[in-house]
A protein has these predicted regions:
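A generic structural signal for residues located within well-ordered alpha-helices
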Residues: 1-4, 105, 128
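Contiguous beta-strand/loop segments that form the cofactor/metal-binding neighborhood of enzyme cores
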Residues: 3-78, 97, 108-116, 150
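C-terminal helix-rich "cap/oligomerization" subdomain common to oxidoreductases
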Residues: 42, 109-151
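Short beta-strand-to-turn element immediately C-terminal to the catalytic PLP-Schiff-base lysine
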Residues: 64, 84-85
Length: 151
């Protein structure tokens, strides 16, 4: 369930990962129902991700730094981005054009690629997709989550 959170972390912090830690609560059917993932980067930065199907979270992405922080409202379907200084003073606010489902940007990018004869999107190249799949696979392995076709 954590693909959007993982992608958000990699988009903003990159992929120079030193290690990951995680904990999970599996559902009765054996899939991840709730998880916490901590990504430790080689340069000392850290991303902490939480995901759950049991309750509705705020879906915010918050990036903290020494001089302030950035809040992205709804990382699945961004609505706005707010930039604050270290005293919580709002410095910038950007509203994102409203979408119906949040998938419009994916459809628009696919349509653009088709029109231009591209087989790979610059915004989400295959190597990033494979990297995210490998991270998800390593988390599933650590949690003991095995898909039926993997047995």
């Amino acid at each position: 369930i954590g693909i959007y959170g993982l992608n958000f972390a990699l988009m903003h912090f990159g992929d120079d990962i030193a290690r990951m830690e995680s904990s999970v609560q599996l559902t009765d059917t054996g899939v991840d129902g709730m998880e916490t993932i901590t990504i430790h980067y080689r340069d000392g930065r850290m991303a902490v991700l939480t995901h759950s199907i049991y309750c509705r979270g705020d879906r915010k992405g918050i990036i903290h730094g020494e001089k302030g922080y950035i809040v992205v409202e709804n990382i699945n379907n961004p609505q706005s981005v707010s930039v604050y200084d270290a005293t919580d003073k709002l410095l910038q606010y950007h509203e994102v054009p409203r979408q119906i489902s949040g998938y419009e940007y994916e459809f628009q990018e696919a349509a653009r690629c088709i029109r231009e004869g591209k087989t790979e999107a610059d915004s989400m190249p295959w190597d990033r997709t494979i990297q995210l799949m490998e991270i998800m696979d390593s988390l599933r392995k650590a949690w003991g989550v095995i898909y039926p076709q993997e047995r």
